[in-house]
Amino acid sequence: MSNYFNTLNLREKLDQLGRCRFMDRSEFSDGCNFLKGKKIVIVGCGAQGLNQGLNMRDSGLDISYALRKAAIEEKRPSFQRATENGFKVGTYEELIPTADLVINLTPDKQHSKVVSDVMPLMKQGAAFGYSHGFNIVEVGEQIREDITVVMSAPKCPGTEVREEYKRGFGVPTLIAVHPANDPKGEGMAIAKAWASATGGDRAGVLESSFVAEVKSDLMGEQTILCGMLQAGSIVCYDKLIADGKDPAYAGKLIQYGWETITEALKQGGITLMMDRLSNAAKLRAFELSEQIKEKLGFLYLKHMDDIISGEFSRVMMEDWANGDKDLLAWREATGKTAFENAPKADGIKISEQEYFDNGVLMVAMVKAGVEMAFDAMVASGIYEESAYYESLHELPLIANTIARKRLYEMNVVISDTAEYGNYLFSNVATPILAKEIIPALQKGDLGEPTPAVDIDNVTLRDVNDEIRNHPVELIGLELRGYMTDMKRISSQG
């Protein structure tokens, strides 16, 4: 097998990268009826597998779980999750042959094995589904010609897929049909019904491509969504301790600060986040964000280039073959950082506004990171809608995982693919920030409010205009209009 994207000519690459259409709600008037009465078998019962299955069952679909024989016999967590929720569970041999749609929701590194095991068991003309296209695009998996291959990719962790559905809403979702596998022309109908069954049509669905989903997803998770939050957490905590701040206070400011700050992003983009600051702090955050862009801009572009070329996937799959040696070493090192081991902040109260006032550097990191990730994707041929969802939109959801159990929780919730990319980025970004940004900080940048200064009206006007007119803000204003029922996700209350 070879990287599918690299087998395409330039015109085909640009076409696939640029596949992005926000679908009208009227296109989902039939809901998930296309899949009703069909047998749907999910392979894998992790966060996405379980929660998508729960939503689909509640939408009236026939859902069961195919697990490896050993997982059933040993009553592994996947078996327990499925059975405790009342699902039918069976081996591949028992369930796959009668399935009309098999959905592969196992980790990326298991996909090739799953495909080789289930493909001989699938009946003629069945469909095969993914929620991430890595196996098709980066591994270059060849699927039987009679099988329809589709994707429905919710843009958030599996737990949020369920919670949003339970409250009558949903999460934005990308859907796609693999152009090499749509023999009956039913792929889009299957993908639409699947997205509707998980609640995606209530929040907005983008018709995309496997290529656009993979390349944008990898870029977002490696840089702003995970890598920047990890690097920022480490250097900000270390700086607070160096300045003599109470370790418990410092830990809480960082742990819950990302979540509080990015909640403003969810409701009103970078503009609202910056508007939570005083005028003096806003100008300073803008200045810091420009400095961060100057120091880290090359790294964002390198990650984008390595994702487009397939170099990232090649290196990561080498680590897969080596027993995840690098991944496990980096995971262990993260667990030993000072931030991860900061004392609990029992009894320490930090108001919502204090997170902004004492976290100006963190606000600057978010602004710079979102804009750099968005710009790098768009410059590489990815449409603005996709770039928005993979940079700004998902950030509050990832920040929420840090609020729960710091970096450990973030790296547990995200995929191994995202975790590996996160370490590649943060391992380089952390020392750059520590050397180039932290030593030049001023009083009020982190850990205490920005001192009041005289404000020049023209300067403030120009900064406000620049913030509000960045392309990520313009497309975000449009897309958030489709998500009028977004709730707060704060774990703090």
Curated annotation (Swiss-Prot):
Q: Name one GO cellular component term.
A: cytosol
Q: Which SUPFAM superfamilies match?
A: 6-phosphogluconate dehydrogenase C-terminal domain-like (SSF48179), NAD(P)-binding Rossmann-fold domains (SSF51735)
Which EC numbers characterise this protein's activity in its record? Answer: 1.1.1.86
Tell me the residue numbers annotated for binding Mg(2+) 2: D217, E390, E394
> Where, in this chain's numbering, is NADP(+) bound?
C45, G46, A47, Q48, R68, R76, S78, D108, K109, Q110, G158
Any one Gene Ontology molecular-function term assigned to this protein's record: magnesium ion binding
| Keyword tRNA-binding carried by entry | no
Q: Report the co-factor binding details.
A: Binds 2 magnesium ions per subunit.
**Record's catalysed reaction(s):** (2R)-2,3-dihydroxy-3-methylbutanoate + NADP(+) = (2S)-2-acetolactate + NADPH + H(+); (2R,3R)-2,3-dihydroxy-3-methylpentanoate + NADP(+) = (S)-2-ethyl-2-hydroxy-3-oxobutanoate + NADPH + H(+)
Ligand binding (substrate)? S415
UniProt keywords, alphabetically:
Amino-acid biosynthesis, Branched-chain amino acid biosynthesis, Magnesium, Metal-binding, NADP, Oxidoreductase, Repeat
Q: Its pathway? A: Amino-acid biosynthesis; L-isoleucine biosynthesis; L-isoleucine from 2-oxobutanoate: step 2/4; Amino-acid biosynthesis; L-valine biosynthesis; L-valine from pyruvate: step 2/4
One Pfam family from the record: KARI_N
Domain named KARI C-terminal knotted: which ranges?
A: 209-345, 346-486
Please give a single GO biological process term from the UniProt record: L-valine biosynthetic process
Family under the similarity heading: Belongs to the ketol-acid reductoisomerase family.
Q: What does this protein do?
A: Involved in the biosynthesis of branched-chain amino acids (BCAA). Catalyzes an alkyl-migration followed by a ketol-acid reduction of (S)-2-acetolactate (S2AL) to yield (R)-2,3-dihydroxy-isovalerate. In the isomerase reaction, S2AL is rearranged via a Mg-dependent methyl migration to produce 3-hydroxy-3-methyl-2-ketobutyrate (HMKB). In the reductase reaction, this 2-ketoacid undergoes a metal-dependent reduction by NADPH to yield (R)-2,3-dihydroxy-isovalerate.
Can you name this protein? Answer: Ketol-acid reductoisomerase (NADP(+))
Organism ancestry: Bacteria, Pseudomonadati, Pseudomonadota, Gammaproteobacteria, Pasteurellales
Q: Which gene encodes it?
A: ilvC
